[in-house]
Regions:
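Short Pro-Cys-Gly-centered "Cys-loop" motif that presents a nucleophilic cysteine in a tight turn
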Residues: 1-61, 68-238
């Protein structure tokens, strides 16, 4: 089966998950050091490849990003650069387990849930006791657990609109972060990423049809319905 082209639409954020072929901690001594280095590469590559970063989490088995690319190739180039740098540092072959998966995220509806999904990944999937304090994630900047700001973090308008001051925004986000996502939200995000279809309402998906790089939602399975002959004749007579 031919693989799907990347789904892209101008100005629309993308949720990205790139899985490593092998956990980094088993490929190099000092798992934290390689994550420090990977995070630096990520930060350095954003401006070079024209990517606005809204949220991120790095783990020993993958990269999770919420970002708005400047063009159709920006995110692909960024991920490829990270893969090349890792392969060189680890003196290995390919580092990713296949292609990264991505989905377009509807602003105003799914951006905050997507942020919570990726920033709570280490708690949900790794059993980390406090994912807010994960050093290789934007979670602490959004909840206020980290002091100061991150120069490369470009907060999405949905985050900015949640409060008038940084404290208000952090408090509002921390509340939703602590509350977590429903099982339905988790399932919708997982399905959109797995299928690489858009994550959003029917109205959002309808709008994407005229601007996206390819069809944003899965078509109906099976052959198109063939109308009975008597209906076809009726149509011609009308």
């Amino acid at each position: 089966m031919a693989r799907l082209p990347r789904l892209y639409a101008p100005g629309i954020p993308q949720l990205v998950h790139a899985r490593f072929l092998f956990p980094l901690a088993t490929r190099a001594s000092g798992g934290s050091r390689i994550l420090d280095t990977l995070q630096k590469w990520l930060f350095d590559g954003l401006a070079r490849h024209g990517v606005m970063l809204h949220a991120w989490t790095l783990t020993d088995d993958g990269i999770l990003l919420l970002a708005t690319p400047g063009d159709e190739k920006s995110l692909s180039r960024l991920i490829q650069m990270l893969g090349r740098n890792l392969a060189t540092t680890l003196r290995s072959g390919p580092v990713f387990s296949g292609r990264y998966r991505s989905t377009l995220v509807e602003p105003g509806v799914w951006v905050i849930p997507a942020m919570i999904w990726l920033e709570s990944w280490v708690a949900r999937e790794k059993g980390a006791s406090d994912s807010e304090l994960w050093p290789w994630s934007s979670a602490g900047f959004h909840t206020g657990a980290f002091m100061g700001s991150c120069p490369v973090l470009n907060d999405h308008a949905d985050y900015w609109s949640s409060g008038n001051t940084p404290f208000d925004r952090q408090a509002a986000y921390k509340y939703r972060y602590t509350e977590g996502l429903s099982s339905g939200q988790l399932q919708q995000i997982a399905q959109a990423l797995h299928g690489q279809w858009a994550l959003g309402s029917p109205g959002f998906i309808s709008q994407l049809c005229s601007v996206a790089s390819r069809r944003p939602m899965q078509g109906r399975r099976g052959r198109p319905r063939i109308r009975p002959i008597h209906e076809q004749g009726q149509s011609l007579e009308e």
